[in-house]
């Protein structure tokens, strides 16, 4: 059904510094679906996530992107976030001097303002924060720490899943979230993603490896190679990639 389409990408081409990275990407994501985008290094996976999030260093040269029927490419990065798009970075940045509590309070209330809602009252915000921290198994003392400063790789990724839980996006884009994680951290990240997934929401999981997809089971798997999606199938494609590699698909 057309009304269950969350994201529709047609003929998307994008470049950075006059170098074309995406060379005609077509992708349709429906509500309730988890899509995995796999591919070799340099295929354009992170460029795709950056273009969807609206990072300014990338120039869209052709194609259309609709999110819930709206022209996504016409929106600013802030408007995309307010509309319900969340991007989890491969390398989360450190923000010295800013506690997680203050960072999240600003982010949550900015999202609410973008939707025409009043800021959360202090008590309601702290209650929400406690619930979501417990949800992703973050210790309460993390709230007082500076954002990602001195965090291990696993703590940084867990913090991002916590941010995702707080902002409650309609479309979550996880860009190589499994990078540098041990198995325990991987399980926690995956369980958080799975628990946040509902029939009205969707996720794009961008990864180079199979192991994350042992814990987050995709409905659809795409192989992105040289800026184009060259193969789309069900979750069985993950095992085929593991067996044959990208060159022999």
Predicted feature residues:
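Conserved beta-strand-loop-alpha-helix hinge in the C-terminal portion
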Residues: 220, 224, 228-249
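Short hydrophobic beta-strand immediately N-terminal to the Walker A/P-loop
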Residues: 35-37, 49
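Walker B catalytic motif
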Residues: 173-177, 184
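ABC-family P-loop ATPase nucleotide-binding domains
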Residues: 93-170
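The feature captures the beta-strand-to-loop junction immediately N-terminal to the Walker
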Residues: 38-43
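Conserved structural motif at the start of ABC-family nucleotide-binding domains
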Residues: 7-9, 22-24
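ABC ATPase NBD Q-loop/coupling interface
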Residues: 64-80, 148
């Amino acid at each position: 059904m057309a009304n269950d389409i969350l994201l529709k990408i047609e003929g998307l081409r994008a470049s950075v510094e006059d170098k074309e990275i995406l060379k005609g990407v077509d992708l349709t994501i429906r509500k309730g679906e988890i899509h995995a985008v796999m591919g070799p290094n340099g295929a354009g996976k992170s460029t795709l996530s950056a273009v969807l999030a609206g990072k300014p260093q990338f120039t869209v040269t052709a194609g259309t992107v609709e999110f819930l029927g709206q022209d996504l490419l016409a929106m600013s990065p802030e408007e995309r976030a307010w509309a319900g798009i969340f991007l989890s970075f491969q390398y989360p940045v450190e923000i010295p001097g800013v506690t997680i509590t203050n960072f999240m309070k600003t982010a949550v209330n900015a999202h609410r303002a973008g939707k025409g809602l009043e800021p959360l009252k202090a008590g309601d915000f702290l209650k929400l924060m406690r619930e979501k921290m417990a949800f992703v198994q973050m210790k309460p003392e993390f709230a007082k720490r500076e954002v990602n400063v001195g965090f291990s790789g696993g703590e940084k990724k867990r913090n991002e899943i916590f941010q995702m839980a707080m902002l409650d996006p309609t479309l979550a884009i996880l860009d190589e979230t499994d990078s540098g994680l041990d198995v325990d951290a991987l399980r926690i990240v995956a369980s958080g993603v799975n628990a946040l997934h509902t029939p009205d929401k969707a996720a794009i999981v961008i990864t180079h490896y199979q192991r994350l997809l042992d814990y987050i089971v995709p409905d659809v798997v795409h192989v992105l190679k040289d800026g184009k999606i060259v193969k789309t199938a069900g979750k069985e494609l993950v095992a085929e990639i593991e067996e044959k590699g990208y060159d022999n698909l």
